[in-house]
């Protein structure tokens, strides 16, 4: 995993590699320019055309909460394409959530750290990507994780 990586830049994505090669290249260019420590993929309107309605609702609700409640530098924390340099890696390894919202915790920590720079990178999906439905149990677990992150906001 990331802890064992010795490359100057790390990228990670979803298991099914749903993003275009151009999206990955653009994200990598943001990091190799040495202007940013973290590059976070962000979904556009076309992305949501491929997502089942309930999943779209949950995604947009979380995006609104992260932007409004947590005031993160990148409100779209759940796009599964991100990258970082050594400074970002250190922050990534300090996360404690090991489920879906680990991305949110990572972006939260980056947004609160004045020594770390982060940039959003618009992404595109590959054609023929299919999304699975979300189980209700996952939502309850992740709601607890969101509350944990929310209370870290006051420390």
Residue ranges of model-derived segments:
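Acceptor/aglycone-binding surface of glycosyltransferases and processive sugar-polymer synthases
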Residues: 1-4, 21-100, 127-144
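Short aromatic/hydrophobic "clamp" motif used to bind/position activated sugar donors
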Residues: 10
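Conserved residues at the C-terminal ends of beta-strands
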Residues: 13, 42, 124
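The conserved acidic donor/metal-binding loop of glycosyltransferases
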Residues: 14-19
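Catalytic donor-sugar/metal-binding loop of nucleotide-sugar-dependent glycosyltransferases
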Residues: 73, 98, 107-126
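C-terminal catalytic/acceptor-binding lobe
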Residues: 115-155
């Amino acid at each position: 995993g990331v802890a064992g990586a010795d490359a100057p830049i790390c990228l990670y994505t979803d298991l099914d590699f749903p993003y275009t090669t151009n999206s990955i290249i653009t994200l990598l260019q943001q990091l190799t320019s040495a202007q940013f420590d973290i590059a976070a993929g962000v979904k556009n309107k076309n992305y949501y055309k491929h997502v089942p309605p309930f999943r779209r609702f949950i995604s947009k609700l979380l995006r609104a909460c992260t932007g409004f409640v947590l005031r993160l530098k990148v409100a779209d924390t759940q796009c599964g394409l991100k990258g970082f340099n050594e400074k970002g890696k250190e922050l990534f390894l300090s996360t404690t959530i090991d489920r879906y919202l680990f991305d949110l915790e990572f972006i939260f920590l980056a947004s609160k750290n004045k020594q770390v720079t982060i940039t959003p990178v618009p992404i595109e999906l590959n054609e023929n990507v299919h999304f699975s439905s979300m189980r209700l149990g996952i939502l309850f677990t992740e709601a607890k994780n969101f509350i944990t992150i929310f209370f870290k906001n006051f420390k």
